[in-house]
Amino acid sequence: MGIRDLLVSGPLGFGTAPLGNMFRDIPDQEAEATVDAAWEHGTRFFDTAPMYGAGLAEIRLGKYLAQHDRDDHVLSTKVGRLILDEIDTDERDSEMFKFGRANRVVYDYTEKGALKSNPICRRVSWK
């Protein structure tokens, strides 16, 4: 399956800012049910960012997508902004960070990872 197949297989993409409690606090079960509903209705394009809930949206989405084959969805994220000052404060054990911040590497976003992905991108069918 090529990227175009994945992008057109669902009705919409799924933006995960609300999963990071952007508008209101969302329990983990509700976040998972929301992503599951999108998946069950054919959505396969997911957009997230480290800034959404100080990483909470990425963590919640990552837990859900880990249950599915990596070739069955497209994951988009943003890079370049870290919240290092918040990680190093006394608040790191507060409600915001109880979900595993500092992040664990699940997908390789390092320079080395990006360089490795370049040949992979060239092999993907865009037709």
Q: Which residues make up each language-model segment?
A:
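Glycine/proline-rich, positively charged
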Residues: F23, E91-K127
